[in-house]
Amino acid sequence: MMRRLAVLSLHTSPLVQPGQGDSGGMNVYVRELVSALAQAGVQADVFTRRWDEASPEVVEVEPGFRVVHVEAGPHDLAKEHLPEVVDAFADGVHKHLEQLGDVDALHANYWLSGVAGHRLKHELDLPLVSTFHTLARVKAETGDPEPERRVRAEAQVIGCSDAILASCGAEADQLERLYGADPGRIELVPPGVDHAFFSPGDRAGARAALRHLRLGDGPVLLFVGRIQPLKGLDVAVRALAALQRPDATLVVVGGASGAEGAEEVARIAALVDDLGLTAQVRMADPQPHHMLSTYYRAADVCVVPSRSESFGLVALEAAACGTPVVAAAVGGLRTLVVDGRTGFLVEGRDPEVFAARVDAILRDDALAAAFGTEAARRGKGYTWSTAAARLRRVYSDLTTRALVDCQ
């Protein structure tokens, strides 16, 4: 029986608001999944690198769920330099785990945590569960290559993990095809959504709550995510131009992220200006997660033009709110968006095609309503309690079998 879990989240904390810096869907994933596990009786400590000297060493989020801040390098260290502090992070986690003494398994999130988890597995003789969230070789296929060091590290962690979590069948296929992962160790555990917040609601009321954005009476397109090239905001902006609807508004919720974030924000601002869309684009700062439901409800269509997406939590949250989604046909978005039933999938990155799909929804109220109803119905099948139940079975199984040897 699983008693206590050590969750590794080196580069980003579940306490940080998603949508800014390196905080995004992974923050939501770790926070919501660990919360659901705690409510199901599995205690968990989430270990993350201290990024703010004012943060206490231990924060109790709720009974059974704590966040432990580990000293590992300068607090303002850029993400590209985090590989240099993995060993210091692992040292700090090791010290805490020796004091706890009753940890049953490690669960690493993202490749950096996986490297630390790989070391700790051997030092502490504990099973290692890995969730990668993004994969270097998948990003390389979209023209966004990562350093070879990351590729090698991911391959090593995949070879040594006792269980590898995939959010959807597409990610499982990528793990097998690109990394030779043992299919017997891949576990399909889709994330969930908090239906207490993300559910259909009154569009007029939502727009009234966002009156500061001056949305007007025309259609509203929504983009939610960190502003970085991977997320494809430029496609959404160009699609707005191609739509040729002066009464349409594109709302962008998110902030600069990663080494290219500031440059991408400037590039998007210049693109908006060049296309003459300044009056039609509204930029909103990253929002507290539960507040995003108001934005989803206010929108006619949510646009998700990512270059790659292991799962696509934004698409799921929009669906749960009954908002049709037009998304790139990549990764987990192929699973979340049922083409022609809950929205549209777009092959390739042609803004004209995105615009045509958005226009089809805007021009047909009956189609939009049908998409929204079916999206909300399907969204109900994704809950964090279900994800936690699946994960508990994975953890329990690991406690009864020998550890996987490194390959």
Question: Which residues fall in each region the model found?
Answer:
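A short helix/loop element that forms part of the nucleotide-sugar donor recognition site in Leloir-type
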Residues: 200-215, 220
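Aromatic "clamp/platform" in nucleotide-sugar-dependent glycosyltransferases that forms part
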Residues: 307
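Short alpha-helical donor nucleotide-sugar binding micro-motif in glycosyltransferases
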Residues: 286, 294-299
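N-terminal subdomain of nucleotide-sugar transferases
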Residues: 1-69, 407
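Conserved donor-binding/catalytic core segment of Leloir-type glycosyltransferases
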Residues: 215-231, 237-240, 251
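Carbohydrate-associated surface elements
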Residues: 170, 192
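Short hydrophobic beta-strand element within catalytic cores of glycosyltransferases
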Residues: 324-327, 337
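Conserved acidic donor-binding segment of nucleotide-sugar-dependent glycosyltransferases
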Residues: 339-340, 344-351, 360-365
